[in-house]
């Protein structure tokens, strides 16, 4: 009986630790530091002002990097949904149906899509926005100022994979 209770306690503890590890808050500015943003954008960037906050909707981490030589930019956002808040998959679907034309991106997270700088998407030229859902998290990566859309998407996917590895 005593051994059974100890075993049950151990299992509950391990499950709790696993659950907490899976829901740990992340800092996107630590995952993609300034030096890496400079490599992604191909030029020096200004010092960012990251923000990491808990709110009634969950945990939110954001960081923007802006190039010093051109209009290039890298925008990073992660929302880890809290209990009772909008589910990330629902939020993704709302974004996808917001009037633009979202391109489905395979092989990243549970679900991913991208808006480009096409007029129907309401974005300026040479801008992509990649949205990735993984579990209770919605990742948003914006890259601006890179004319080659395929290159910008590849860079955004690499950033997404780095963030996904920390969730």
Predicted region positions:
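N-terminal secretory signal peptides that target proteins for export/translocation
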Residues: 1-4
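Bacterial N-terminal signal peptides
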Residues: 6-17
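Intrinsically disordered and other compositionally biased segments
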Residues: 15, 20-21, 53
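A short, solvent-exposed beta-edge/loop patch
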Residues: 22-24, 29-30, 34, 38, ...
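Short, solvent-exposed recognition patches
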Residues: 39-126
């Amino acid at each position: 009986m005593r051994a059974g209770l100890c075993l049950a306690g151990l299992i509950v503890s391990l499950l709790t630790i696993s659950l907490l590890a899976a829901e740990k808050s992340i800092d996107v500015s630590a995952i993609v530091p300034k030096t890496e943003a400079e490599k992604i954008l191909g030029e020096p960037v200004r010092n960012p002002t990251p923000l990491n906050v808990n709110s009634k909707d969950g945990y939110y981490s954001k960081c923007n990097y802006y190039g010093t030589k051109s209009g290039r930019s890298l925008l990073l956002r992660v929302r880890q949904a809290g209990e009772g808040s909008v589910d990330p998959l629902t939020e993704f679907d709302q974004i996808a149906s917001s009037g633009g034309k979202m391109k489905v991106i395979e092989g990243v997270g549970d679900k991913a899509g991208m808006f480009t700088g096409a007029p129907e998407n309401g974005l300026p030229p040479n801008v992509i926005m990649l949205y990735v859902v993984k579990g209770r998290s919605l990742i948003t990566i914006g890259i601006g100022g890179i004319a080659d859309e395929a290159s910008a998407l590849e860079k955004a996917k690499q950033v997404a994979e780095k963030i996904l590895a920390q969730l």
